[in-house]
Amino acid sequence: MAVSESWTKKYLAEVLGTFVLVFLGDSFVAFAVAGAGGNGFKAGLLGAGFFWGFAVTLAIYACGAVSGAHLNPAVTLSLAWRRGFPWSKVPGYIGSQIVGAFIAAMGVSFVWNGIIVHYEVASKIVSRGDPNGVTSGLIFWANWPHPGLVGYTGDYLTQDPWWRGAGTEIIITAILVICILGIVEDRMPSAANLAPIAIGFVVAALVGLFAPIEMASLNPARDIGPRIWGLLIGYGSNAIPGQNFNLWVTTGMPLIGGPLGAWIYDFFIHQHLPAPVGPDTVPVAESARARA
C-alpha cells in the first residue's frame, strides 16, 4: 500500500493507531483491576504485558501503512533526531498521539464505567480525588510507584524513591527504541511484515517485567492523554500532576529515554553495519522502517 503524502492523513492515522493501542491496553487494565467482582488484579502483570504487546502489534498494523505508526512521542522524537523525520511535523504527530490516547480513555470510561464504579464502591473510594482514588485511576494512566502493589498512603513513596522510577522509565524506554531500530533496520535482511509482531513482543516483555515498579509507561501520549480525561472525570490531582507529581516520571522520562536509546543504537550498532550490496540484501519497507 502506498504511503500517503498528505500529512493530514498521517496525523489522523496516528490518532487512530494510538486510539487502538490505548483502548485495548487500558481495557485490559480495567478488567485486571476492576473486573471479577471488583476484587482487582485478576489477570496479573504478565497478562498486562501480553495484552499491551498485542495492542501495540494491532495498532501498528492498523495505521503503519499511512503514518508509519510512531504511536509514541518518544519514538517520534527519536526518529526526528536520528532518522531524518521532519522536525516541523513532530508537534503534529505528538498532538495526534495525545488526542488518540485521550479519545481512547473516553472510550474505556464509557465501556467499563459500570465495572469501574462497582470496584470503587467495593474499595470504599468515596471520591476519585481522594488518595485511594489513584487505584482506579491506574486503569487509565501509568503511576509511580505502582499503587496496587505498594499502596497509596504513608511511606510508600519512600519505599520506592523518585529516582528509581525515573531511572527505570529512562532505561526501559531506551531499550524499547533500541529494539525498534534494530527490528526495522534497513541495512539488515528482515521480514518487514513481522516487525509489528516483534515490536509487540518487546513491549510485552518490558511491561510484564517492569510494571511492578512504576507501571512501565514507555509512552508519554499513553500517559498524558488519559490523565487529561481523568482530570475531567473527577480524579483531580491524582491525574494531574499525580501523587507526588509522578506525571514527570511517567510522561517526562520516556522523552529522555527514547532519544537516548536511539543514540546508543547508532553508536554501538548502526554505524558499524555494512552498506547493503547485491540482490540478496532485502531492505525493510519504508512503512515498517517508519513504524518505529
List each model region and its residues.
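Membrane-interface helix-loop junctions and terminal tails of multi-pass membrane proteins
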Residues: 1-292
